[in-house]
């Protein structure tokens, strides 16, 4: 038995104390890590329900356990809402992460050693798109494509590599690429060369849902995503696919790479998809893109370089070399000023991966807390103020005070 009256703070004061400190950090800091966001109270409430207790191997109506009649309702709501949100023919909401969603597609359509094209990690791709240190790069023969001389996705290179290597699958999508991706063109290249197309929109999903970024679903055979990041849901993954691939994808997820699904997380996914279907979310997605544009333009005015010259999404890579500071140091000093970013390699980066010449910035979280263009411009200027004098403690303290004033005015959960 457990004591129903005991709260978390009473059962485990150490964990409770860390959570309280993290709450303060999230309220006080400007969050600019492009992959982070703030889930709504409703999404978090769904994750803390009794659904965490339920095992439900299988799919709605076809479970290997009894007592699944109510979790069936929840999972079917998540599936139906996801399909409606993106216009998908079929969907699987069980992947526990974006990485597992990608792995599920690979399991479904590839054999070890098959050739795949994916965007180079060094030029904006993701670990699961064939990086040598990742299982994808160890199991399959990934050939990397990248950017052209103008730091735009090199579609001509993709086409040339597809003709030369005849891959089974082409993977599109990125973790650090600011511009629109021409999914229709990539689909044509893939299908003309006998390949399938998988698009990973983990970073762009919220913008796609809100009409602020191109939708790959009409063009791709498979679309994978996380449900957090710009979609503002719980941490997890999804796969959307053409109806003809539904059976093999479902089998690849369960029993292929996962057992019982996390039903409390699937409930939170359903809630997040419902939120994303609202007119307010469309406005949010548009504001994310507007804020990113202002952030990038202001940083350029302050002497920094944006990789690819601009952003057409929520994310941007900032080349710090004009300021003579590394990404590692910039991350640290901006953190002292209560501005949270992550160091990130830029194309052809001369620095080591743990040092880097750049930082990656994103606007989903700042927009969730109510930042608009004026706050985005101010944030960019505060970043530049720190980077202009990164070793001046008085300067960092002055910026931190202004950040604290701004975040107190626009709290996340109410302070």
From Swiss-Prot:
GO terms for biological process: glycine biosynthetic process from serine; tetrahydrofolate interconversion. This is Serine hydroxymethyltransferase. The modification N6-(pyridoxal phosphate)lysine is found at residue 229. The lineage of its organism: Bacteria, Pseudomonadati, Pseudomonadota, Betaproteobacteria, Burkholderiales. Pathway: One-carbon metabolism; tetrahydrofolate interconversion; Amino-acid biosynthesis; glycine biosynthesis; glycine from L-serine: step 1/1. PANTHER family: SERINE HYDROXYMETHYLTRANSFERASE. Keywords: Amino-acid biosynthesis, Cytoplasm, One-carbon metabolism, Pyridoxal phosphate, Transferase. The gene is glyA. GO terms for molecular function: glycine hydroxymethyltransferase activity; pyridoxal phosphate binding. It comes from Bordetella petrii (strain ATCC BAA-461 / DSM 12804 / CCUG 43448). Belongs to the SHMT family. InterPro entries: PyrdxlP-dep_Trfase, PyrdxlP-dep_Trfase_major, PyrdxlP-dep_Trfase_small, Ser_HO-MeTrfase, Ser_HO-MeTrfase-like, Ser_HO-MeTrfase_PLP_BS, SHMT-like_dom. Its EC number is 2.1.2.1. It is found in: Cytoplasm. Catalyzes the reversible interconversion of serine and glycine with tetrahydrofolate (THF) serving as the one-carbon carrier. This reaction serves as the major source of one-carbon groups required for the biosynthesis of purines, thymidylate, methionine, and other important biomolecules. Also exhibits THF-independent aldolase activity toward beta-hydroxyamino acids, producing glycine and aldehydes, via a retro-aldol mechanism. (6S)-5,6,7,8-tetrahydrofolate binds at residues 121, 125-127.
